[in-house]
Amino acid sequence: MFRLTQYMHQLLDPSPPRRRSRPDAVRPVVIWNLTRSCNLKCRHCYTVSADRPFPGELSHDQAMAVLRDLSDFRIPALILSGGEPMSRFDFWELAEEARRLDFRHLSLSTNGTKIDAGNVERLAGLGFDYVGISLDGIGAVNDWFRGVEGAFDQALAGVRACKAQGVKVGLRFTITEGNAHHLPAMLDLCRDEGVDKFYLSHLVYAGRGDKHRGEDTEHARTRRAMDLLIARAWQAVERGEPLEVVTGNNDADAVYFLRWAETRFAPAAVAHLRAHLQAWGGNSSGLGVGNIDPQGRVHPDTYWSDYTLGSVKERPFSAIWTGDDPILATLRTRPRPLKGRCGACAYQAVCGGNTRIRALQLTGDPWAEDPACYLSGSEIGAEGADLDRLAVTPFRGKSHDPAHRFL
């Protein structure tokens, strides 16, 4: 996640950067997909969820054991996700246990349609540090994107219910060619509803998102969206407004913002910003982020579903994460063994090579270039790198064997 607002504040009120610990000492933010079941049918769903039960998901006892292990492992944050996490049969019990174990940060990632007047007080009482609700446009655009008529109104009611109870709530918007025109209205909605955070997510080629990868935004449209997002975020910072703006799944955003700063601030301020961005390091799959899927399989992040590090049904997450898996070790290497224009990029220390899954899905090689980088070769210090760019081709099945070890 690229915390745009946070880095804007570094330009106005600088503080020393804090570098990451040694890779073997880093504890990951864990995104736990509690269930694959979901009452919506989103076009970009990386878990290919549906409104039905799925076999093999963790039992209640297994899930409770996972919580205890994660607590003992001292992870910095736990995000309960899905599917729709509130669809899981024991969601409330798991959430209560997570709060009892006193995780440093506990978040809920939900479609918002199941939050209502009948349960929001209970949700607020659990003390979630943050509730993220997905909306992919206004009204019918969101409902088309999410596959169920009325989903927008239900999710917005969930946002309002959370705000009424004092719960910190944010909106997550996945941008595509089909809904990019709604970005201004989504930002207006955040302002009008007093939403605490806006998360712009770029499309990742996983699950249904891979099948619909042809709907990914063209580079020119992505740039226009980022121009708008930066302008609105900067306006909020200058006015002292509380809205936090972040982006995800395209770490080229950090490079784009750095270049924005270069045209507006003194060299010393830009150098300070770059030091902070390099301390952050960009893509954190397998290092600062880890994933447990509904069946208990552990992955480098939520989009690496084809690559399993182990199962919490057989070994604790803590043991799997501190094991000697070769892909995990390579993901933690800096610089990563990147190829193509990513390998030639002068900003590897800022973006970390971006989202490796897009490269994997298109080429079968997780270290190939990420086609979603929207900066030109000259902008990334790689003249000529645009002559033979990796193209986003229509989905015709996987270009790699999911059992392949990617070595």
UniProtKB/Swiss-Prot annotation:
- One MF annotation (Gene Ontology) recorded for this entry: catalytic activity
Organism the protein comes from: Paracoccus pantotrophus
**UniProt-annotated binding residues for [4Fe-4S] cluster 1:** C38, C42, C45
The protein's matches in SUPFAM superfamilies, at most eight in alphabetical order, are given as: Radical SAM enzymes
Q: Which residues form the Radical SAM core domain?
A: 24-236
What pathway does the UniProt record associate with this protein? Porphyrin-containing compound metabolism
Give the highest taxon in the source lineage.
Bacteria
What is the name of the protein in this document? Answer: Pre-heme d1 synthase
Binding-site list for [4Fe-4S] cluster 2: C342, C345, C351, C373
